[in-house]
Amino acid sequence: MAISAKDVMELRKQTDCGMMECKKALTEADGNFEKAIEILRERGLATAAKKASRVAAEGMVYAEYCPKCKVGVVIEVNAETDFVAKNDKFVDFVKEATKVVMLQNPADVEALMACKTEAGETVDEALKNLILVIKENIKIRRFVRYEGVCSAYVHGGGTHGILVNFETTNDIDSKDEFAAYGKDIAMQVAAANPSYVDEASVPAEVVAKEKEIMLAQMAGDPKNANKPDAVKQKMIEGKIKKFFKENCLVDQEFVKDGDLSVAQYTAKVAKDLGGEIKIVKFTRFVKGEGLEKRADDFAAEVASMVK
Protein backbone atom coordinates (compact mmCIF):
# COMPACT_ATOMS: atom_id res chain seq x y z
CA MET A 1 0.00 0.00 0.00
CA ALA A 2 1.32 3.43 -0.98
CA ILE A 3 1.76 5.81 1.96
CA SER A 4 1.19 9.47 1.11
CA ALA A 5 3.29 12.33 2.44
CA LYS A 6 0.09 13.82 3.87
CA ASP A 7 -0.50 10.69 5.99
CA VAL A 8 3.09 10.74 7.21
CA MET A 9 2.78 14.42 8.18
CA GLU A 10 -0.49 13.76 10.02
CA LEU A 11 1.03 10.89 12.01
CA ARG A 12 4.07 13.01 12.80
CA LYS A 13 1.75 15.76 14.03
CA GLN A 14 -0.05 13.31 16.33
CA THR A 15 3.05 11.62 17.74
CA ASP A 16 5.95 14.08 17.31
CA CYS A 17 8.03 11.19 15.96
CA GLY A 18 10.47 11.49 13.06
CA MET A 19 9.27 11.38 9.45
CA MET A 20 11.01 8.10 8.62
CA GLU A 21 9.71 6.45 11.80
CA CYS A 22 6.18 7.52 10.92
CA LYS A 23 6.49 6.26 7.34
CA LYS A 24 7.81 2.87 8.50
CA ALA A 25 5.03 2.53 11.08
CA LEU A 26 2.33 3.39 8.53
CA THR A 27 3.80 0.93 6.04
CA GLU A 28 3.82 -1.86 8.63
CA ALA A 29 0.26 -0.97 9.65
CA ASP A 30 -0.99 -0.88 6.02
CA GLY A 31 -2.00 2.74 6.46
CA ASN A 32 -4.01 2.17 9.66
CA PHE A 33 -3.37 5.20 11.89
CA GLU A 34 -4.33 3.55 15.19
CA LYS A 35 -2.13 0.56 14.44
CA ALA A 36 0.73 2.85 13.39
CA ILE A 37 0.49 4.78 16.66
CA GLU A 38 0.48 1.48 18.54
CA ILE A 39 3.61 0.39 16.66
CA LEU A 40 5.35 3.66 17.52
CA ARG A 41 4.35 3.32 21.16
CA GLU A 42 5.68 -0.23 21.24
CA ARG A 43 8.94 0.96 19.73
CA GLY A 44 9.00 3.76 22.25
CA LEU A 45 8.74 1.26 25.07
CA ALA A 46 11.58 -0.77 23.58
CA THR A 47 13.62 2.39 23.18
CA ALA A 48 12.90 3.32 26.77
CA ALA A 49 14.17 -0.06 27.94
CA LYS A 50 17.37 0.37 25.91
CA LYS A 51 17.92 3.87 27.22
CA ALA A 52 17.26 3.00 30.85
CA SER A 53 20.93 2.08 31.31
CA ARG A 54 22.13 5.49 30.11
CA VAL A 55 22.98 8.11 32.72
CA ALA A 56 20.27 10.70 33.32
CA ALA A 57 21.78 13.48 35.43
CA GLU A 58 20.33 16.56 33.72
CA GLY A 59 16.66 17.56 33.54
CA MET A 60 15.06 19.85 36.10
CA VAL A 61 13.94 20.35 39.67
CA TYR A 62 10.49 21.86 40.21
CA ALA A 63 8.61 23.06 43.30
CA GLU A 64 5.02 24.16 43.73
CA TYR A 65 2.70 25.12 46.60
CA CYS A 66 -1.10 25.09 46.56
CA PRO A 67 -2.36 27.71 49.07
CA LYS A 68 -5.93 26.43 48.75
CA CYS A 69 -5.13 22.80 49.69
CA LYS A 70 -2.05 23.76 51.73
CA VAL A 71 0.23 21.17 50.16
CA GLY A 72 3.71 21.75 48.75
CA VAL A 73 5.83 19.50 46.53
CA VAL A 74 9.41 19.56 45.28
CA ILE A 75 10.40 17.02 42.63
CA GLU A 76 13.41 16.10 40.49
CA VAL A 77 13.03 14.58 37.03
CA ASN A 78 16.24 13.69 35.22
CA ALA A 79 17.12 13.43 31.53
CA GLU A 80 20.38 12.90 29.67
CA THR A 81 20.95 16.40 28.27
CA ASP A 82 20.37 19.86 29.71
CA PHE A 83 18.40 21.21 26.73
CA VAL A 84 15.56 18.78 27.47
CA ALA A 85 14.62 20.98 30.45
CA LYS A 86 13.55 23.63 27.92
CA ASN A 87 11.28 21.21 26.05
CA ASP A 88 7.62 22.14 26.66
CA LYS A 89 6.48 18.50 26.71
CA PHE A 90 9.11 17.64 29.31
CA VAL A 91 8.16 20.62 31.48
CA ASP A 92 4.47 19.74 31.18
CA PHE A 93 5.22 16.19 32.30
CA VAL A 94 7.16 17.43 35.34
CA LYS A 95 4.29 19.73 36.33
CA GLU A 96 1.73 16.95 35.82
CA ALA A 97 3.79 14.59 38.00
CA THR A 98 3.97 17.32 40.64
CA LYS A 99 0.20 17.70 40.57
CA VAL A 100 -0.25 13.94 40.97
CA VAL A 101 2.04 13.92 44.01
CA MET A 102 0.18 16.88 45.46
CA LEU A 103 -3.31 15.40 45.04
CA GLN A 104 -2.73 11.65 45.44
CA ASN A 105 0.09 11.56 48.01
CA PRO A 106 2.00 8.48 46.74
CA ALA A 107 4.40 6.90 49.22
CA ASP A 108 7.40 6.86 46.88
CA VAL A 109 8.46 7.06 43.23
CA GLU A 110 7.33 3.49 42.55
CA ALA A 111 3.86 4.29 43.88
CA LEU A 112 3.80 7.52 41.88
CA MET A 113 4.44 5.63 38.64
CA ALA A 114 1.22 3.65 39.19
CA CYS A 115 -0.90 6.76 39.87
CA LYS A 116 -3.18 8.05 37.12
CA THR A 117 -2.82 11.47 35.55
CA GLU A 118 -5.65 13.82 34.67
CA ALA A 119 -5.63 12.33 31.15
CA GLY A 120 -6.37 8.85 32.55
CA GLU A 121 -3.02 7.19 31.83
CA THR A 122 -0.58 6.18 34.54
CA VAL A 123 2.48 8.32 35.22
CA ASP A 124 4.56 5.37 33.99
CA GLU A 125 2.67 5.33 30.67
CA ALA A 126 2.98 9.11 30.33
CA LEU A 127 6.72 8.85 30.96
CA LYS A 128 7.22 6.14 28.36
CA ASN A 129 5.24 8.13 25.81
CA LEU A 130 7.46 11.13 26.57
CA ILE A 131 10.60 9.03 26.02
CA LEU A 132 9.17 8.03 22.65
CA VAL A 133 9.04 11.70 21.66
CA ILE A 134 12.19 13.07 23.30
CA LYS A 135 14.34 9.98 22.68
CA GLU A 136 16.27 10.25 25.94
CA ASN A 137 16.33 8.28 29.15
CA ILE A 138 14.05 10.17 31.57
CA LYS A 139 13.52 9.25 35.21
CA ILE A 140 11.59 10.62 38.15
CA ARG A 141 14.33 10.53 40.75
CA ARG A 142 12.73 11.81 43.95
CA PHE A 143 10.11 14.05 45.50
CA VAL A 144 9.11 15.48 48.88
CA ARG A 145 5.58 16.47 49.86
CA TYR A 146 4.71 18.72 52.82
CA GLU A 147 1.26 19.38 54.22
CA GLY A 148 0.59 22.76 55.83
CA VAL A 149 1.75 26.29 55.06
CA CYS A 150 4.67 26.22 52.61
CA SER A 151 6.78 28.32 50.30
CA ALA A 152 8.10 26.88 47.04
CA TYR A 153 10.94 28.36 45.00
CA VAL A 154 12.66 27.29 41.79
CA HIS A 155 16.05 28.79 40.99
CA GLY A 156 18.02 28.93 37.76
CA GLY A 157 15.29 27.55 35.53
CA GLY A 158 15.19 24.28 37.46
CA THR A 159 18.73 23.82 38.81
CA HIS A 160 17.53 24.22 42.41
CA GLY A 161 14.15 23.54 43.98
CA ILE A 162 13.30 24.59 47.53
CA LEU A 163 10.30 23.75 49.71
CA VAL A 164 9.93 25.29 53.18
CA ASN A 165 7.26 24.33 55.71
CA PHE A 166 5.95 26.78 58.34
CA GLU A 167 3.61 26.93 61.31
CA THR A 168 1.68 30.20 61.60
CA THR A 169 -1.10 31.77 63.67
CA ASN A 170 -3.91 34.27 63.05
CA ASP A 171 -4.19 33.33 59.36
CA ILE A 172 -1.16 35.48 58.52
CA ASP A 173 -0.12 33.04 55.79
CA SER A 174 -2.97 34.40 53.62
CA LYS A 175 -1.32 37.83 53.43
CA ASP A 176 0.85 38.96 50.52
CA GLU A 177 3.57 40.03 52.95
CA PHE A 178 3.85 36.47 54.22
CA ALA A 179 4.21 35.15 50.66
CA ALA A 180 7.10 37.60 50.16
CA TYR A 181 8.64 36.47 53.45
CA GLY A 182 8.25 32.80 52.49
CA LYS A 183 10.03 33.41 49.20
CA ASP A 184 12.85 35.17 51.06
CA ILE A 185 13.33 32.15 53.32
CA ALA A 186 13.26 29.73 50.38
CA MET A 187 15.84 31.88 48.58
CA GLN A 188 17.94 31.86 51.75
CA VAL A 189 17.92 28.06 51.69
CA ALA A 190 18.89 28.10 48.01
CA ALA A 191 21.76 30.54 48.51
CA ALA A 192 23.17 29.63 51.94
CA ASN A 193 22.55 25.86 51.86
CA PRO A 194 21.83 25.25 55.56
CA SER A 195 21.89 21.68 56.83
CA TYR A 196 19.44 22.09 59.71
CA VAL A 197 16.55 24.36 60.77
CA ASP A 198 17.94 25.23 64.22
CA GLU A 199 20.39 24.09 66.89
CA ALA A 200 17.87 21.68 68.42
CA SER A 201 17.62 19.77 65.14
CA VAL A 202 21.36 19.10 64.90
CA PRO A 203 21.96 15.47 65.99
CA ALA A 204 24.07 15.10 69.14
CA GLU A 205 26.51 12.83 67.29
CA VAL A 206 27.14 15.59 64.72
CA VAL A 207 28.01 18.09 67.46
CA ALA A 208 30.21 15.49 69.18
CA LYS A 209 32.05 14.80 65.92
CA GLU A 210 32.63 18.52 65.34
CA LYS A 211 34.08 18.87 68.85
CA GLU A 212 36.31 15.86 68.23
CA ILE A 213 37.63 17.45 65.03
CA MET A 214 38.21 20.77 66.81
CA LEU A 215 40.16 19.08 69.62
CA ALA A 216 42.30 17.25 67.07
CA GLN A 217 43.01 20.54 65.28
CA MET A 218 44.04 22.16 68.57
CA ALA A 219 46.31 19.24 69.44
CA GLY A 220 48.11 19.69 66.13
CA ASP A 221 48.48 23.45 66.53
CA PRO A 222 51.55 24.51 68.60
CA LYS A 223 49.78 27.73 69.61
CA ASN A 224 46.87 25.87 71.22
CA ALA A 225 48.18 22.41 72.14
CA ASN A 226 49.46 23.40 75.59
CA LYS A 227 46.66 25.74 76.60
CA PRO A 228 44.65 24.84 79.74
CA ASP A 229 41.62 22.62 79.22
CA ALA A 230 39.29 25.40 80.41
CA VAL A 231 40.63 27.71 77.70
CA LYS A 232 40.29 24.98 75.08
CA GLN A 233 36.70 24.41 76.18
CA LYS A 234 35.90 28.11 75.73
CA MET A 235 37.46 28.03 72.27
CA ILE A 236 35.40 24.98 71.32
CA GLU A 237 32.20 26.67 72.52
CA GLY A 238 32.99 29.60 70.25
CA LYS A 239 33.69 27.31 67.30
CA ILE A 240 30.44 25.38 67.87
CA LYS A 241 28.51 28.68 67.87
CA LYS A 242 30.14 29.48 64.54
CA PHE A 243 29.20 26.00 63.25
CA PHE A 244 25.56 26.61 64.21
CA LYS A 245 25.59 30.05 62.57
CA GLU A 246 26.85 28.57 59.32
CA ASN A 247 24.71 25.42 59.25
CA CYS A 248 21.42 26.24 61.02
CA LEU A 249 18.91 28.20 58.94
CA VAL A 250 17.52 30.40 61.73
CA ASP A 251 21.03 31.27 62.97
CA GLN A 252 22.35 32.23 59.54
CA GLU A 253 22.93 35.82 58.50
CA PHE A 254 19.94 36.87 56.39
CA VAL A 255 21.23 37.15 52.82
CA LYS A 256 19.13 40.24 52.03
CA ASP A 257 20.10 42.12 55.21
CA GLY A 258 23.39 41.27 56.89
CA ASP A 259 22.35 43.12 60.06
CA LEU A 260 19.70 40.48 60.79
CA SER A 261 19.74 36.75 61.38
CA VAL A 262 16.99 34.67 59.76
CA ALA A 263 15.42 34.26 63.22
CA GLN A 264 15.39 38.04 63.74
CA TYR A 265 13.91 38.64 60.30
CA THR A 266 11.24 36.01 60.99
CA ALA A 267 10.35 37.62 64.34
CA LYS A 268 10.10 41.05 62.70
CA VAL A 269 7.75 39.83 59.95
CA ALA A 270 5.61 37.92 62.47
CA LYS A 271 5.25 41.02 64.63
CA ASP A 272 4.38 43.21 61.63
CA LEU A 273 1.71 40.72 60.51
CA GLY A 274 0.25 40.24 63.99
CA GLY A 275 0.95 36.55 64.45
CA GLU A 276 3.61 33.93 65.00
CA ILE A 277 5.85 32.15 62.47
CA LYS A 278 7.91 29.03 63.01
CA ILE A 279 10.11 27.46 60.34
CA VAL A 280 9.42 23.74 60.72
CA LYS A 281 11.46 22.02 57.99
CA PHE A 282 12.83 22.46 54.49
CA THR A 283 14.03 20.46 51.50
CA ARG A 284 16.65 21.65 49.03
CA PHE A 285 17.06 19.69 45.78
CA VAL A 286 19.90 20.42 43.38
CA LYS A 287 19.56 18.96 39.90
CA GLY A 288 21.75 15.91 39.43
CA GLU A 289 23.49 16.14 42.82
CA GLY A 290 25.16 12.84 43.62
CA LEU A 291 24.62 11.48 40.12
CA GLU A 292 27.35 10.58 37.65
CA LYS A 293 27.31 12.98 34.70
CA ARG A 294 27.03 11.53 31.22
CA ALA A 295 30.35 11.08 29.41
CA ASP A 296 29.85 10.34 25.74
CA ASP A 297 32.22 7.88 24.06
CA PHE A 298 31.54 8.17 20.32
CA ALA A 299 33.74 5.21 19.34
CA ALA A 300 32.02 2.93 21.87
CA GLU A 301 28.60 4.11 20.70
CA VAL A 302 29.43 3.36 17.05
CA ALA A 303 30.88 -0.04 18.01
CA SER A 304 27.70 -0.96 19.89
CA MET A 305 25.56 0.01 16.90
CA VAL A 306 27.36 -2.30 14.47
CA LYS A 307 27.34 -5.37 16.74
Write out the residue ranges for each language-model feature:
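N-terminal assembly/interaction segments in proteins that build large macromolecular machines
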Residues: A2-K307
